Design a protein with these regions (language model features):
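Pocket-lining segment of extracytoplasmic ligand-binding domains
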Residues: 90-92, 100-102, 130, 165-264
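Second-shell loop/turn segments in exported
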Residues: 32-39, 65, 111, 142-147, ...
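Bacterial N-terminal signal peptides
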Residues: 9-20
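Segments of small-molecule ligand-sensing domains
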Residues: 247-299
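Positively charged n-region of N-terminal signal peptides that target proteins for export
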Residues: 1-7
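Acidic, polar ligand-binding/catalytic clefts
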Residues: 83-118, 196-200
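N-terminal secretory/targeting leader peptides
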Residues: 31-34, 38-39, 49-76, 80-83, ...
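Bilobed "Venus flytrap"/periplasmic-binding protein-like clamshell domains
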Residues: 28-56, 61-64, 116, 120-185
C-alpha cells in the first residue's frame, strides 16, 4: 500500500514538473498599455497595438490596451509600474523627470521614451457665430477643458493660465466625445482638445453646428507662450480638415511618445517596436487612424 501510494506521489510530482516546464506553460510577459479617453488618439494607439495580428500571435508577450484619463495619468502609472507602456506627451515626460509638474514635485525617473508617435495640436472649437475669436474671449463662458488627469486638461490649464483666463471661465472637465455632445446641446460655448487631427469629436460637433477653430497660434505668439514653454512647436491645422473651416488655423503642438517603464525587459521593448515599425505594422497603424502616417523609422 505504501509502495503504491509512493508511486502515485512520484507520478503526480513528475506530471507537475512536465506541466511547469512544458512550452505551452511558459508565462507570458504581460504588458498593460495605457491609452486615453474615448474620442482621443491615445486610445487608438493602444488599441491598434493590441489588435495587430503579429502582436496578438506572440507566444511570450501579451499586450492589453487600457483606457485612462490621458498623459498625466499614464506618466504616473507607468512610473510606478501599474502600466508597463503607455502614450505620454513629451512635455509631461520632461516636466515629470525634472520634478516640475504642477503641484507635484515628484521626479518621475522610471519612464523611458522608446519612440516618437505623432504631433498632437491644441484645438479650441467654438460656434461660428459665437463672437469668440481669441482665448481671451472665453471669459464668462462654459468651456470643456478635457478629462481631469489628462494631458488635454493639463495643457489647457497651462495655456489658459498663461493667457489669464483659467479662473475666469466655467470649467467642465470631460472627455472629447462628451464635450462634443454637450457643445451640440448648447451646454458648452467651446471645448478644448489636445489631440491629432482630424478628431472624431470635432467631426461630430461639425455635423450639428457650424464651427470655427480659434487661432491659438496668434494667442501663443503674442503672449510669449513659446518662450515660456519651448517644448511646444508651431503648426497649422489645414483648411478643410473639418466641415465649414475653410482656412488654415495656426496652433501649437506637443509630441506624443511611446514610453515604457525602465524595468520592462529590453527584448520585449525591441520586439514590439520591431513589429509595429515594420512595413506591415505601420500600414496597420495608418489603417487605424490617418494621423499615424507620421510614424516612421526616421522619426
Amino acid at each position: 500500500m505504501r509502495k503504491s501510494l509512493f508511486s502515485a506521489v512520484v507520478v503526480v510530482a513528475a506530471l507537475a514538473l512536465v506541466l511547469t516546464f512544458a512550452p505551452g506553460a511558459v508565462a507570458k510577459e504581460r504588458v498593460i498599455f495605457g491609452g486615453g479617453p474615448a474620442g482621443g488618439t491615445f486610445q487608438v494607439v493602444a488599441n491598434g497595438i493590441q489588435v495587430f495580428d503579429a502582436v496578438k500571435n506572440l507566444e511570450n508577450i501579451s499586450v492589453k490596451a487600457q483606457t485612462s484619463a490621458g498623459s498625466v495619468e499614464n506618466l504616473r502609472k507607468t512610473d510606478d509600474g501599474k502600466q508597463q507602456m503607455s502614450v505620454v506627451y513629451s512635455g509631461h515626460v520632461w516636466l515629470g523627470r525634472n520634478g516640475k509638474m504642477k503641484n507635484d514635485p515628484k521626479k518621475y525617473e522610471n519612464v523611458m521614451a522608446v519612440a516618437w508617435l505623432y504631433g498632437a495640436p491644441a484645438q479650441l472649437v467654438v460656434k461660428k457665430d459665437s463672437g469668440i475669436e481669441s482665448t481671451k474671449d472665453l471669459v464668462g463662458k462654459k468651456v470643456g477643458v478635457g478629462n481631469a488627469g489628462s494631458g488635454a486638461f493639463a495643457n489647457c490649464e497651462l495655456f489658459f493660465t498663461h493667457m489669464g483666463v483659467w479662473d475666469k471661465i466655467e470649467r467642465n472637465a470631460m472627455g472629447y466625445n462628451d464635450a462634443a455632445a454637450a457643445f451640440g446641446n448648447n451646454q458648452l460655448d467651446a471645448f478644448w482638445l489636445f489631440t491629432a487631427f482630424p478628431s472624431g469629436a470635432v467631426i461630430m460637433a461639425a455635423q450639428t453646428n457650424d464651427i470655427s477653430l480659434v487661432d491659438l497660434g496668434a494667442d501663443a505668439e503674442a503672449s510669449g507662450f513659446f518662450k515660456a514653454y519651448p517644448y511646444f512647436g508651431k503648426l497649422n491645422i489645414p483648411a478643410g480638415t473639418y466641415r465649414g473651416v475653410d482656412t488654415d488655423t495656426p496652433s501649437f503642438q506637443d509630441s506624443a511618445l511611446w514610453v515604457a517603464n525602465k524595468d520592462v525587459p529590453d527584448e520585449v521593448v525591441f520586439k514590439l517596436l520591431e513589429l509595429i515599425y515594420s512595413e506591415e505594422g505601420l500600414k496597420h497603424m495608418v489603417g487605424q487612424k490617418k494621423t499615424f502616417k507620421e510614424m516612421s523609422l526616421d522619426t
